[in-house]
Amino acid sequence: MDPVQIRSLSLEALAYLGDAVWELHVRTRVLLPPRRLQWLHGDTVACVRASAQAKLATCLSPHLTVEEADWLRRGRNAGGTVPRRLDPATYRLATAFEALLGYLFLADRDRLGVILHLCDEFQHHHGPDTPSPEA
């Protein structure tokens, strides 16, 4: 997809795509070592919940290019209905994280791989729902 087409997409559409990218990445990552399905599911849910995504967005910020930081900012400011059970700031950061991944999936798969690796490293060292070092 060319840059003009990507920019024509709504931030919600990019977040929709980014949600799928992140979930598939996490599901692939948790497959090894082999475990029961319930453990795979539990590990996946811990990593893809909004609070974990919001922490990743915060931790990624210093590693982003100017353009990526702009996509993250735009994603955070996107409209949308916040689920009642979530803090609005957490939801918006999680949406920003997903929008960034959606953008990178369409625009730069190599860079997406770098960002996903950074996310994996953070979650490996700190756990999916551990407060970020900056918090």
Curated annotation (Swiss-Prot):
Involved in correct processing of both the 5' and 3' ends of 23S rRNA precursor. Processes 30S rRNA precursor transcript even in absence of ribonuclease 3 (Rnc); Rnc processes 30S rRNA into smaller rRNA precursors. Its main location: cytoplasm. The keyword GTP-binding does not apply. Its cofactor is Mg(2+). This is Mini-ribonuclease 3. Keywords: Cytoplasm, Endonuclease, Hydrolase, Magnesium, Nuclease, Ribosome biogenesis, RNA-binding, rRNA processing, rRNA-binding. The keyword Membrane does not apply. It comes from Gloeobacter violaceus (strain ATCC 29082 / PCC 7421). The active site is at residue 19. SUPFAM superfamilies: RNase III domain-like (SSF69065). It is found in: Cytoplasm. GO terms for cellular component: cytoplasm. One of its GO terms (biological process) is rRNA processing. It comes from the Bacteria. Homodimer.
